[in-house]
A protein has these predicted regions:
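Short loop/turn motifs that connect adjacent beta-strands in outer-membrane beta-barrel proteins
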Residues: 132-166, 177-181, 217-230, 275-285, ...
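Flexible, solvent-exposed coil segments and beta strand-coil junctions
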Residues: 186-196, 246-252, 286-293, 326-335, ...
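Extracellular/periplasmic loop regions
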Residues: 427-542, 569, 617
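Predominantly the C-terminal beta-signal and adjacent terminal strand-loop region
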Residues: 594-640
């Protein structure tokens, strides 16, 4: 019997076996006609989605049939909800989440590992998950980085918030070049009878890098920054150089014209920890200690390197502002692979910068920065036997360089006009400049501006770069601008002949590879000291970028190059009236991403320098002129 009396009312029972007549008859029954209620079985029968077979999850029937009590409520003793366990998309690995509770009712099923909740197998378009398409719910395996993968931070390795990332990368660079190459007439020459100071300009340089990076981090994988990160990345390099003049691979002419080297190191390693949350909008402050990459401005005009440092960084005002404070204790670089060793460099660099997004115009970012370079006095020969500190010119005595850079840079767009700019002023002191033969005070400046417009698939670019030169080598003020370790992505970047090639002049380099500055530094910029007695440069660029397809881009550039002043060069080579014209740099490059991502990148370029009067005066033969110089390269990056 019922425990209490109720008024007669219609019981809203669910349909049984989708029979409408059954539903009508049940709705007409009055509760007062029953003295008791018999409990009925509660079967669970999954049925297919009849309206869309094979698409979407199955439609489940109600697991209860006519088992309401007379108050219209479910019974207390319900059968547990049963369901199909579908595998998650991608490669998930084994879950490390140990269940802490079991199912106790049909209303709630514990799913403690929220990352591995499966979905029905679904071939959305009936095309068997093509490899190059963005296809949902694709099955994965451990060797496929394009679907969700435990090794690519898509699923936690430990618990709910600790992830592992494995990166395996290969980079292969082949570089053919023609640059002025001095002969060795007093020792020996590979070609008897050579009379000119500069001989065969041809050379081939090959670099192969293998990187294996392991990263463990703790976080939520959305907008929230990581709580902590640990990363280590060993790198192996092999390199090969072939030239046609002696004294290039080594000062010892007996070393020949070919050189093959290898080097292995722990290139990147650091520990990162979040110190504080600065706002409810995921603003944070973190610290990172160890060997880490860092570029100090938008285009790498002053500093771009990977070395040992302690960095304090974070965001403010809903990520509208960003800041960095970083102190580098530089390690020595391997001469031929440019990788870090574990030997101290004797150079300390401090950098502070602050970014403000949407400055004046939406999409326009401004940056203020400060750099300080303390390069201590030392005597250093590189692994090929070349003197790199101090410069092997003039008074080659160890000296200390202290330089402070003050900079302001912008990057972004103003309406449809893309704009990048930078201005820097450097001041400091060199205790004994080898060329000036005396201590000098540093006072130099530089500026850069790039404007571009992209109405469609073509981007039109115009840019200019200026670095002041020194017009009096005999005073005690050095006004030639030099960077710390630059790698500018500007005016053609790595596709440009002038920027990509290293051009020697007597015992130094007129300019270093991956640099715009003719700074007369020794050997390479990683091991030598900054030199502020240099001719400076004026560069004007016109370029066009063509987005041929979603996968392929064509980059073309034309650079007009001039020394700012040639007074330093005239004293350096004991030659009067050197013109300022360096020449015209023409380049054409292609960049392809066949898989529409960074797992496979191919770059190739061809470039040439049409020498101007100033270049002819420095490198011209006894009779005739310097021929046009050409270079070509290929660069293949593969990553997992």
């Amino acid at each position: 019997m019922l425990p209490f009396q109720i008024e007669s009312w219609t019981v809203p029972l669910p349909p049984v076996h989708n029979d409408p007549t059954r539903l009508e008859s049940l709705n007409d029954i009055r509760l007062c006609e029953f003295d008791f209620l018999e409990e009925l079985p509660a079967p669970f029968e999954p049925v297919e989605n009849q309206s869309h077979p094979g698409r979407g999850p199955p439609i489940l029937k109600d697991s209860f049939e006519n088992i309401y009590d007379l108050s219209g409520e479910r019974p207390i003793a319900e059968p547990l909800f049963r369901y199909f366990a579908y595998p998650p998309a991608g490669f998930t690995g084994s879950s490390s989440v140990v269940p802490s509770e079991s199912q106790e009712s049909a209303h709630f099923v514990p799913m403690e590992d929220r990352w591995r909740i499966g979905v029905p197998i679904w071939d959305r378009y009936g095309r068997d998950h093509p490899r190059l398409d963005d296809y949902p719910q694709a099955p994965g395996n451990i060797f496929n980085p394009y679907t969700q993968n435990l090794l690519k931070e898509d699923f936690p390795l430990i618990g709910q918030n600790t992830f592992f990332n494995l990166n395996v990368a290969s980079r292969t660079i082949a570089n053919f070049r023609q640059v002025p190459t001095p002969t060795t007439p007093f020792e020996s020459t590979p070609t008897p009878g050579e009379e000119d100071f500069f001989g065969n300009p041809n050379g081939f340089f090959f670099l192969q890098y293998y990187t294996l990076a392991f990263e463990l981090n703790h976080g939520d994988k959305t907008f929230k920054p990581n709580d902590w990160r640990i990363k280590v990345a060993p790198v192996i390099n092999t390199n090969y150089l072939e030239v046609y003049e002696l004294g290039v691979v080594s000062p010892d002419v007996a070393a020949g014209t070919r050189r093959s080297r290898g080097f292995a190191t722990l290139e990147e390693w650091f520990l990162e920890a979040k110190l504080a949350d600065l706002s409810p909008d995921y603003d944070f402050m973190s610290v990172r200690a160890g060997s880490q990459p860092f570029t100090s401005d938008f285009r790498g005009f002053i500093f771009s390197d990977l070395n040992r440092a302690v960095r304090l960084f974070g965001t403010r005002l809903s990520n509208r502002d960003q800041f960095n404070l970083i102190l580098f204790d530089q390690r020595e670089k391997d001469t031929n692979s440019f990788l870090n060793s574990f030997d101290p460099r004797g150079q300390t660099i401090f950098i502070a910068n602050y970014f403000r997004q949407d400055f004046i115009w939406p999409g326009h970012t401004v940056q203020a920065s400060f750099h300080f370079d303390n390069d201590q006095a030392s005597l250093k020969y590189d692994k090929n036997g070349n003197l790199v500190r101090p410069d092997p010119v003039g008074l080659a005595t160890p000296h200390e360089v202290n330089a402070a850079y003050f900079g302001l840079a912008t990057d972004g767009h103003i309406n449809e006009l893309n704009i990048t700019s930078a201005m820097y002023y450097v001041t400091g002191h060199d205790t004994l400049n080898p060329q000036a033969l005396q201590p000098v005070n540093i006072s130099a400046y530089s500026g850069a501006l790039e404007l571009s417009y992209s109405p469609d698939w073509i981007r039109y670019r115009a840019s200019a770069f200026y670095a002041s030169g020194d017009n009096n080598i005999n005073d005690n003020i050095a006004t030639g601008f030099d960077a710390i370790i630059d790698n500018p992505q500007f005016a053609g970047g790595e596709f440009s002949f002038w920027q990509r090639q290293s051009i020697k002049l007597l015992g130094t380099n007129l300019k270093n590879f991956n640099s715009l500055l003719p700074d007369l530094r020794a050997s390479n910029k990683f091991q030598s000291q900054a030199n502020f007695l240099n001719p400076g440069i004026r560069l004007f660029n016109l370029g066009m970028d063509f987005e041929l397809t979603q996968r392929t881009r064509l980059i073309s550039n034309c650079n007009f190059l001039y020394f700012d002043t040639t007074a330093v060069l005239q004293s350096f080579v004991f030659q009067d009236n050197i013109p300022t014209s360096i020449g015209t740099d023409l380049s054409l490059g292609v960049e392809s991403r066949p898989l529409l991502n960074n797992n496979w990148i191919f770059r190739a370029g061809i470039s040439g320098l049409l020498p101007g009067d100033g270049f002819q005066a420095l490198y011209g033969p006894i009779t005739g002129q310097v021929p046009n110089l050409f270079a070509a390269f290929t660069d293949l990056e593969l990553a997992f």
